[in-house]
Design a protein with these regions (language model features):
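Feature marks short, surface-exposed loop/turn motifs that line or immediately flank catalytic pockets
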Residues: 23, 109, 137-139, 174-177, ...
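Conserved beta-strand segments of alpha/beta enzyme cores
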Residues: 99-101, 167, 209-211
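N-terminal secretory targeting modules
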Residues: 1-66, 71-77, 91-97, 224, ...
Length: 254
């Protein structure tokens, strides 16, 4: 046997032993480790782990998020918006939900959102629909009765877009007076007005059999927790939106 064949057999023997060693690393061992969460990032947009075969899977439930700056996520990246983080929280807890379809713009009042819905060509119905609207009605001193009338009109549109009962969520209006932007304003007056609008929202949800979640109290923590506000000193940071997402998941889905 020449030297080349001896070296070749030696290499093969070492390789075989290494591959069959009980200490060799198995991918499933890594991915099951709670401290190893790279899949949380790589699977964010797809809503699944990269080691899952989704080629033959059924499409996950659809999600339509309606609102204003608080839904579009003014001042944060798209993946930090509360609807996107809500999907992440759901997926992490084993409930697959598709990435959100968002109809929202900074500055929108109820009738702006209503007009946008009227002008949108919807091609399907949705499994989950959220509504977070009203802060700009309050900020611009619009009558609360106008707000209530618009809510009824919005619900008519939403009912035509939902797949089933129990799928619509009403979210309370955050208290922007607790942000640095509201520091030199009458915070008590702002809170009183926000509470009035939210009482109307909660009553509206109860009358129509809709789920309701309060994120206002989370927003009021911003007075003592500046990291809950983004760099514009007004809108929530991704951290606050994560707090919302967790609470919304527990109330709406879990």
């Amino acid at each position: 046997m020449n030297l080349f064949k001896i070296l070749k057999l030696t290499y093969f023997f070492i390789f075989f032993i290494a591959c069959s060693s009980p200490n060799s690393i198995d991918y499933e061992d890594i991915i099951s480790n709670e401290d190893y969460c790279e899949w949380c990032e790589s699977g964010r947009q797809e809503g699944s782990r990269p080691d899952q075969d989704t080629s033959n899977s059924i499409s996950p439930p659809s999600f339509l998020a309606l609102g204003d700056s608080y839904t579009i996520g003014e001042g944060v990246n798209g993946d930090q918006r509360w609807p996107n983080q809500f999907v992440d929280v759901a997926n992490y807890n084993g409930i697959q939900i598709d990435q959100p379809i968002i109809i929202a713009e900074t500055g929108w009042k109820t009738y702006d959102l209503l007009n946008a819905i009227k002008q949108t060509n919807f091609t399907k119905k949705y499994d989950y629909i959220s509504l977070l609207i009203g802060v700009n009605n309050q900020f611009n001193s619009r009558p609360i009765n106008e707000f209530k009338d618009d809510l009824d009109k919005l619900l008519t549109k939403i009912n035509n877009l939902k797949k089933k009962d129990g799928s619509v969520l009403i979210i309370s209006i955050p208290d922007w007076g607790s942000s640095p932007f509201g520091e030199n304003m009458d915070r008590n007056q702002i809170s009183t007005e926000i509470n009035s609008f939210n009482n109307s929202l909660k009553s509206f949800a109860n009358i129509n059999g809709l789920k309701y979640v309060d994120v206002t109290e989370i927003s009021r923590r911003a007075i003592n927790e500046p990291n809950l506000i983004t760099s514009d000193n007004l809108h929530p940071s991704g951290l606050m939106y994560l707090e919302w997402a967790k609470k919304i998941f527990n109330v709406w889905i879990n």
